[in-house]
């Protein structure tokens, strides 16, 4: 699984380009989700991580928009999703994307169309800090509405890892050689390596610092049993006892524990990696009115509250966040002020990072 200031309306030129697809002027229209939800109908294709359309989650959307035929397709990784989107093997209306993966790249490649936020009433409740993250907007236009977020930290099995880890350096502790894992993601892995060797601002590393991180990760490659690729992959590694400690997320630790294997989560002192995910509308969307309705629903109080209660995600809607019970605030981390949050987003020299990570895995 796994961010997004901006213009309130589309520029007139963009609107002209999208006129055939139903772009509005920013005022209420027949396509506005706030005007006539009962009139919104037709097939709507959503391409997302599996949790983006679990039955309990989308139940309220289906009740609100009974004439919409919701068709869903899941992807397990952002890399495979982007490949399918670029080759045209999938043709969704609404697409799930994450800042720590490839949201900014998808925007650059034209996967998304600019959003008319006047058709997304819940946009005004979205945390302003999340609106600033890469991939949410580009050249003054909004492309992605962030809806959920989470802390990247360390997961561990308390039966095997003691005392509790406090630092990213603990992933490289020789006591856990062969029992550790890091997410197979260039941004995540390189951020962790940088923080472990004392680089405090990994997103702005120069080439010399990147080389330093690469050499460190290669030197410690035998520490790691594997690089985990998906949430399911990581959860299974804990279930089978193949790993004791890993980079991971608060919600993953909750899921592992719920499935019978005690699993704890901590925020390392050097910095916390923050993932943020959201939704955009495909540049080739066929059902714009339903797509806007879906994105507005994803950002709604009811949907956001479900995410916090069910998966213990941080949520983007400030109105929903203010209504959470204290227990859920704590479990989801929505009450926590982070000491050194690091947006898990693509750096400006992302291609160089990708090459470094490839070198680490093949080195």
What are these regions (language model features)?
Residues 18-22:
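C-terminal motif of bacterial Sec signal peptides marking the signal peptidase cleavage site
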Residues 24-27:
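Bacterial signal peptide processing site
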Residues 33-105:
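Early extracytoplasmic/lumenal segment of secretory-pathway proteins
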Residues 48-55, 91, 96-242:
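Extracytoplasmic ligand-binding site segments that recognize negatively charged/polar headgroups
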Residues 101-105, 244-262:
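A ligand-binding cleft/hinge motif common to bilobed small-molecule-binding domains
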Residues 210-220, 228, 259-283:
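Periplasmic-binding protein-like
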Residues 277, 282-341:
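Mature extracytoplasmic/periplasmic domains
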Residues 338-363:
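Conserved C-terminal helix/tail region of periplasmic/extracytoplasmic solute-binding proteins
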């Amino acid at each position: 699984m796994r961010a997004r200031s901006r213009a309130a309306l589309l520029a007139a030129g963009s609107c002209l380009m999208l006129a055939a697809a139903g772009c509005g002027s920013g005022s209420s229209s027949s396509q506005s989700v706030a005007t006539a939800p009962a009139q919104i109908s037709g097939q709507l294709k959503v391409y997302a991580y599996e949790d983006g359309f679990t039955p309990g989650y989308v139940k309220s959307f289906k009740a609100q928009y009974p004439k919409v035929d919701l068709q869903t397709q899941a992807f397990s990784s952002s890399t495979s999703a982007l490949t399918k989107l670029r080759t045209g093997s999938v043709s969704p209306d609404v697409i799930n994307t994450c800042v720590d993966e490839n949201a900014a790249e998808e925007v650059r490649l034209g996967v998304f169309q600019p959003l008319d936020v006047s058709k997304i009433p819940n946009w005004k409740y979205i945390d302003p800090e999340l609106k600033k993250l890469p991939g949410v907007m580009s050249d003054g236009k909004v492309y992605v509405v962030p809806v959920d977020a989470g802390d990247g930290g360390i997961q561990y099995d308390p039966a095997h890892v003691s005392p509790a880890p406090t630092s990213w350096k603990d992933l490289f502790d020789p006591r856990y050689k062969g029992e550790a894992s890091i997410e197979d993601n260039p941004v995540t892995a390189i951020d962790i390596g940088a923080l472990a060797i004392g680089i405090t601002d990994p997103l702005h590393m120069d080439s010399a610092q990147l080389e330093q991180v690469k050499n460190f990760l290669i030197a410690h490659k035998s520490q790691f049993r594997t690089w985990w690729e998906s949430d399911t992959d990581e959860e299974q590694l804990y279930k089978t006892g193949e790993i004791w400690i890993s980079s991971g997320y608060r919600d993953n630790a909750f899921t592992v524990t719920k499935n019978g294997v005690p699993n704890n989560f901590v925020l390392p002192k050097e910095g916390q990696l923050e993932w943020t995910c959201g939704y955009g509308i495909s540049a080739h969307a066929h059902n714009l009115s339903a797509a806007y309705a879906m994105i507005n629903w994803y950002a709604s109080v009811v949907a956001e509250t479900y995410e916090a209660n069910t998966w213990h995600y941080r949520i983007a809607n400030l109105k929903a966040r203010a209504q959470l019970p204290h227990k859920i605030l704590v479990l989801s981390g929505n009450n926590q002020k982070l000491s050194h949050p690091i947006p898990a987003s693509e750096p400006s020299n992302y291609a160089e990072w990708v090459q470094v990570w490839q070198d680490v895995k093949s080195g």
